[in-house]
């Protein structure tokens, strides 16, 4: 780096110091040495391959939310990324690229930035372990602080950031031209007359620019929310402010919450920004808005953000978050296979992952989609990734669903890798000293990894000292493996056979794969630990024509459902009918963003996102005969009316950021999923050219017969007359996890990541029909 460049960067750093400090205060990091380190920046080696490893200067921008890096080329837009786009930062040689291209001795100098969505990971090497640690710690601090902001604080941060970008010359003043640019930045279109009127109203000094208090006035004018003003005005009965008694009245009357005066006082203490008001136990309008947009005001019941269900029931009594073809990042014909795909699925709470294993060169088993052009990943690397990430998002058991195509020798190596790498986490014996009679519970299996696959003998052989040891034998292929080869229609006697090594067989304890023929046959011949896999079409047929028998079967045994082999694009089927039939392991392609994955994410949103959700009692108790397709009187029938008022949206993202004048025309769709009789949807009209604060005030009414199986999805779309409507954001959750009253609905991207500052404001009421 030349002396001139160093001087330029030093000057820029001094210029940015004030703005950076202001943002540091906003992020809660004022005076933080790690933040200062990121603002100063430093050289890092960017790693793409063995031959492509280049020095780049990285620095945190003064807005404290943008990182840019500079090479010998001129500054380019694509050389920046937002803190909001980062999913996680991993210290060490955690990525496939760093493991492959960087030597072990540089382990502590390495770190990876993992992005949300499809953007490739950024693999970096610092000049020292200390610098690497500072980068990782600094970035994690900012990410954590941004995540901990409530919706209102994120909104304020976002608007201020947009204001800064609109201030082209950086003079901390706003001209009329800059104001128009700012309005487009925040996704709202205003005509020249309205913009001029707004500007003139705030330009009290008549200087032709807005500055200081004038900008503050403009900000307050812009962010004032009519719907909040009306609610606040109705309940703020103490000299125009809201006392603890007023707040208690609001919480009990509108929000239908069972709270005390002490609870109301606690909320004021927590959310009121004005110190004088707080000391007098009063809530200003700003404090009220913060209260509505934080955890307590969210549509998701805060109690459901933790594990709150009984986790001591048998595994078969839970819906289990499950992935299909977990190793794929994209489609099933030519997409890449990666350990990263396993990491992402596990971090999303997935508790059943699939491993499609084939013989590899040099005696090393590989994971990939057979008979296709998908890339390959080493089996042992996948097992290491599972070891490292299995229990970061959830402490409850992980099931490895093996689709084994390997020779005897490589099967033995597979068993060796699982035992040696997973260690004590791998379940190799049944729990207890006697042959069990039912599946263990998630509670009993905390921190354990189970293997699902073929087994040579019955489980009771483990307790039979006189048992004749079987070293190897042939077994029929997994049903899904047979489908890949076109054997699924053959009689059982003609199905493909594979030789199974005892070492691998012995690792299958509670999830022994068996072929399904009929429910009667399963009841007579199969034990509780023997489970079957069903192609989606077969499962759908059973769910439609024999739902009660399927539900009863799933009270004792596990069932796994997988997508049809014809879904080469990794598309997904509707999981709801399978859940309605009590199926636990409903495996979806996690790598494919779609409505079905939204519903899956919504199903497993409550209970602390732990990947296990307890089925309703009428799907666990053999005394009941529930049929979702033909509703009769029973404990499942709790007919209720769901009233939803879609009031407004806030700070919807621009879909085409490359076109400054591109503004969304949003509309909202509310969808109900559940038993066939409960499926419904309604949608608002679209609002032209306003993604900043569109308002609908539209009321809808839904009749729900089986609320315990109902799932609600809020979808926001951009209306388009010439082509298909574009996705903006969505949020899905079980009806039983929804809070009543005025609620904030966060919005997620297609890939399930939170959209900072964006949200819906709705009113929800559930009454007996």
Located regions from the model:
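Long, acidic (Asp/Glu-rich), low-complexity accessory segments flanking structured domains
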Residues: 117, 147-162, 170, 178, ...
């Amino acid at each position: 780096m030349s002396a001139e460049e160093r001087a330029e960067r030093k000057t820029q750093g001094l210029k940015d110091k004030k703005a950076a400090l202001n943002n540091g205060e906003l992020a809660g990091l004022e005076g933080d040495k790690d933040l200062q380190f990121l603002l100063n920046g430093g050289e890092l080696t960017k790693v793409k391959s063995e031959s492509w490893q280049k020095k780049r200067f990285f620095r945190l921008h003064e807005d404290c939310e943008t990182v840019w890096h500079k090479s010998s080329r001129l500054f380019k837009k694509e050389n920046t990324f937002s803190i909001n786009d980062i999913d996680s930062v991993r210290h060490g040689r955690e990525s496939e690229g760093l493991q492959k291209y960087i030597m072990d001795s540089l382990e502590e100098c390495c770190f990876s930035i993992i992005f949300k969505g499809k953007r490739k990971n950024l693999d970096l090497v610092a000049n020292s372990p200390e610098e690497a640690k500072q980068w990782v710690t600094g970035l994690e601090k900012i990410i954590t602080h941004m995540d901990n902001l409530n919706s209102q604080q994120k909104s304020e941060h976002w608007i201020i950031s947009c204001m800064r970008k609109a201030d082209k010359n950086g003079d901390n003043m706003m001209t009329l031209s800059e104001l128009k640019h700012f309005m487009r930045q925040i996704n709202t279109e205003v005509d020249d007359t309205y913009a001029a009127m707004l500007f003139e109203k705030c330009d009290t000094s008549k200087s032709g620019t807005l500055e200081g208090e004038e900008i503050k006035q403009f900000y307050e004018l812009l962010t004032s929310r009519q719907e909040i003003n009306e609610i606040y005005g109705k309940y703020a009965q103490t000299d125009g402010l809201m006392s603890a008694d007023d707040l208690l009245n609001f919480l009990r009357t509108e929000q239908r919450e069972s709270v005390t005066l002490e609870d109301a006082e606690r909320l004021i203490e927590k959310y009121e920004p004005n110190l004088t008001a707080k000391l007098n136990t009063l809530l200003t309008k700003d404090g009220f808005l913060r209260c509505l947009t934080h955890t307590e005001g969210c549509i998701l019941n805060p109690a459901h953000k933790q594990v709150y269900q009984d986790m001591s029931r048998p595994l078969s009594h839970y819906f289990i978050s499950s992935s299909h073809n977990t190793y794929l990042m994209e489609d099933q014909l030519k997409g890449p296979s990666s350990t990263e795909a396993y990491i992402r699925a596990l971090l999303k709470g997935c508790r059943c992952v699939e491993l499609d294993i084939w013989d590899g060169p040099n005696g090393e088993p590989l994971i990939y989609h057979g008979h296709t052009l998908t890339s390959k990943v080493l089996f042992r690397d996948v097992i290491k990734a599972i070891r490292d990430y299995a229990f970061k998002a959830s402490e409850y058991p992980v099931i490895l669903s093996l689709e084994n195509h390997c020779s005897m020798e490589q099967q033995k190596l597979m068993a060796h890798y699982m035992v040696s790498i997973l260690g004590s986490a791998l379940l190799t014996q049944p729990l207890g000293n006697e042959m069990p009679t039912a599946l263990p519970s998630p509670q009993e299996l905390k921190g354990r990894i189970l293997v699902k696959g073929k087994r040579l003998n019955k489980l009771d052989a483990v307790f039979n000292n006189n048992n004749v040891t079987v070293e190897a034998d042939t077994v029929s292929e997994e049903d899904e493996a047979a489908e890949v080869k076109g054997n699924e229609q053959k009689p059982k006697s003609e199905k493909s056979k594979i030789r199974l090594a005892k070492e691998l067989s012995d690792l299958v304890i509670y999830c022994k794969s068996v072929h399904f023929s009929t429910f009667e046959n399963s009841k007579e011949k199969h034990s509780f630990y023997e489970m079957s896999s069903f192609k989606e079409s077969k499962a759908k047929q059973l769910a439609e024509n024999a739902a009660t028998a399927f539900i009863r079967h799933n009270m004792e045994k596990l069932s796994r459902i997988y997508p049809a082999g014809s879904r080469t694009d990794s598309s997904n089927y509707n999981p709801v009918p399978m859940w309605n039939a009590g199926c636990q392991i409903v495996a979806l392609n996690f790598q494919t963003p779609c409505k079905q994955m939204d519903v899956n994410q919504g199903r497993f949103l409550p209970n602390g996102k732990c990947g296990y959700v307890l089925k309703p009692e009428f799907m666990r108790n053999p005394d009941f005969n529930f049929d979702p397709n033909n509703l009769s009187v029973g404990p499942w029938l709790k007919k209720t009316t769901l009233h939803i008022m879609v009031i407004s949206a806030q700070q919807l993202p621009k879909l085409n950021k490359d076109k400054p004048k591109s503004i969304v025309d949003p509309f909202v769709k509310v969808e109900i999923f559940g038993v066939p009789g409960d499926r419904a949807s309604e949608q608002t009209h679209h609002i032209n050219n306003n993604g900043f604060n569109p308002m609908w005030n539209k009321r809808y009414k839904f009749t729900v017969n089986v609320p315990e199986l109902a799932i609600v999805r809020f979808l926001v779309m951009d209306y388009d007359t010439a082509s298909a409507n574009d996705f903006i954001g969505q949020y899905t959750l079980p009806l039983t996890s929804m809070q009543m009253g005025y609620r904030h609905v966060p919005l997620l991207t297609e890939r399930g990541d939170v959209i900072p500052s964006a949200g819906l404001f709705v009113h929800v009421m559930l009454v007996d029909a």
